[in-house]
Amino acid sequence: MCVVGAGPAGAALAGACQRLGLATALVDVAPDRPWSATYGMWTPELPPDLPAGVVAARAEGRVVALTDRLLGWEYAVLDVPALQAHLSEGLSGVRVYASRAVGSPRPGVLALADGTELQASIIVDAGGQARPLNLRRRGRERAAQTAYGMFLDEQLAAPLIEPGEALFMDWRQEHGEDGWPTFLYVIPLGGGRVLVEETSLARRPGLPLPTLHRRLRTRLARYGIVPPADAAVERVAFTVDHPRHRASGVLGFGAAAPLIHPATGFSLATSLRLAPQVAAALAANLPRGPKPALTAAHDTVWPRSARIVHHLRRVGLEALLRMPPADVPAFFEQFFELPERHRWTYLTARDDVAGNVAALTHLFRASNRRLRGHLVRPALLPPLPSNEPVLN
């Protein structure tokens, strides 16, 4: 089999397949390039086989919408070089091609930019947001999560979080601007460093990074924080409403699938947990041929229950995109007032239909008439074409 994309999802799946005895190849234009993103997940989502050393910091989750509250959940921030080293160790025996995949012209064939064609029983697109094997015409404008962050010394960032704490969301308008709502995200990284980030959860199209940079500096200034001129920065921009990967004869995996939670942007925990399951489905069914194996793998990534939950979450995303900016903090206040089991299910349980329906039903019943309208309207209307009329 052949996996396109040597990011966390692709590396995890390629390694899992190799461990089960499947001859595996991995294709990436720069397979050894260091991963630059910051990754975190809730502690109960950590895969059981992930070494303890891959977790750089653990912190108690806190949110601020209309009020300030602790979530009662622990957030794990990963040591990304350690994660990459761990997953790379699993690639022993995997044949790696440093090349760019340009398509799958026919079943079982992967075309590379240099004209080479690789033969494989199963081809997986784990190429992230680029989805190099899902060559479809661009449709409507996509919604994106964007963020601008800075890496600061923990003492400099001390006014924002207490020791042992992670600020998951702070919706207070301390950035001093009207227009599209954004929140502050602050997490400890270990080693005395903290990431402070101004984030637009979702917008169609994504909120420009210069806007987020400006807001972050204004927000930090309110706390007397002046970042050093040489502070390292993080720039984030990724689509949160890609349609499901439907390229013929290809399995989409990771962000390419997309396994991204439409309402949070998280996908790593799901990808790491699914990788061994997908590998097992392929290994069990390949003796029957590529088609049964591909079907089994696709059903592992997208069982009917996961498709239903993904649709419900997409409706939630559209509700957020249509919501007047002034109502967004009140919406999140209502959401975080939900019983813990409902919050946890909506944020993490990708195939629990009954649990997600119960969470949304509870949210609807607890909401006032105005918020109920915001929740129902997206289910009755087509996706909003653009948020551009809203000031940014």
Q: Where are each of the predicted segments found?
A:
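N-terminal FAD cofactor-binding segment of flavoenzymes
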Residues: A16-T67
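Conserved Rossmann-like nucleotide-cofactor binding loop
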Residues: A9, D32, A130
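C-terminal helical "tail/cap" subdomain of flavin- and related membrane-associated enzymes
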Residues: A279-N392
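Beta1/beta-strand and adjacent pyrophosphate-binding region of the FAD-binding site
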Residues: M1-A9
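FAD/FMN-dependent oxidoreductases across multiple families
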Residues: E174-H175, T199-L282, P287
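Short beta-strand to alpha-helix junction loop
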Residues: R69-E89, A126, A202-T211
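Predominantly flavin-linked oxidoreductase catalytic cores and closely associated redox partners
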Residues: G93-P227, R244-R246
